[in-house]
């Protein structure tokens, strides 16, 4: 019976530890180096050139975060190049409404692939900002 409790405790610990490392972040600058490993001594793998691009943090080591993007590219980025601002990229064209209801005034058409900043969300609606539009 002790082995069963130990196994359950072990499983719970590693499940919550793994999920704690996974968070969503955005790129802070319009030019961010992605490296092969968690340090400046590792060579640059590729360079992002999009500010606010959403990425998912999947691991961390000291001041570096391992990230993965929407196209499943992954690598290591220094924490100074990341921020905790939520952003999204819609997969299809969307309509931006002035209020959180389908009956409110549409104020813009959002093209797929555009980076949108998320200000806050309820169960069904998110308040977003893109360029000069907000809704």
Where are these regions (language model features)?
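SH3-family beta-barrel domains
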Residues: 18-36, 46-51, 58-132
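Second-shell loop/turn segments in exported
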Residues: 38-42
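Short, active-site-adjacent cap segments at secondary-structure transitions
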Residues: 135
């Amino acid at each position: 019976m002790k082995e069963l409790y130990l196994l359950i405790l072990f499983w719970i610990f590693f499940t919550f530890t793994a999920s704690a490392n996974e968070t969503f972040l955005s790129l802070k600058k319009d030019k961010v180096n992605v490296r092969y490993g968690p340090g400046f001594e590792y060579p640059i793998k590729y360079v992002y050139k999009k500010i606010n691009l959403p990425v998912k943090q999947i691991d961390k080591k000291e001041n570096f975060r391992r990230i993965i993007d929407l196209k499943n590219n992954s690598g290591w980025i220094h924490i100074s190049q990341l921020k905790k601002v939520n952003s999204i990229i819609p997969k299809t064209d969307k309509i931006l409404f002035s209020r959180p209801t389908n009956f409110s005034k549409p104020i813009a058409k959002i093209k797929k692939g555009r980076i949108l900043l998320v200000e806050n969300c309820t169960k069904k609606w998110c308040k977003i900002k893109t360029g000069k539009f907000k809704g």
